[in-house]
Amino acid sequence: MTESQQAYAILDGRAEAGPGAPAQPCFLKTYRAVIAGGPDEQLPSEGILRDYLFKDSRKGRVFPVKRPRKGVREAVLEYRIVETAPDGSLSLAEITLHTGRTHQIRVQFASRKHPLYGDGKYGSRFKGDIALQSAGLQFVHPETGEKMAFQLEKPIKAPWDLNLSLIHISE
């Protein structure tokens, strides 16, 4: 079992920290993003995205690549589309990171033709701030062993409220 898998099992209550468990507290980070489009063949309504990412520091961008090589790191996230706008132009996704790579969420969705709202760097046609929110954090307290969980509510404004987004986009 990898360290990440162990962390999820502990936080979900399916396993106990014990011999071989990471000495550091295990963190489970969740995010919310508004993405272009709705579920399709490239991005079903839920799943796991697994890619190899290459960070090009000279260009200031991260690119998905086909296979591992020097400078390439695996990126894995789990997502679920929880809501899609009536016209199908935008969707709200909940995301759990299994790895934490630079621009990981942005690149993995954009590479499947679903860039984040406002993310012109990775292909969004929508103008505005990038619609990516750190939504939650879970960890086991290092001294008490208590499971700690913190959640943020979804903002009630465009583009987070998809109905308000449709009005905002059409203006």
Give names to the regions the model predicted.
Residues 1-166, 170:
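RNA pseudouridine synthases
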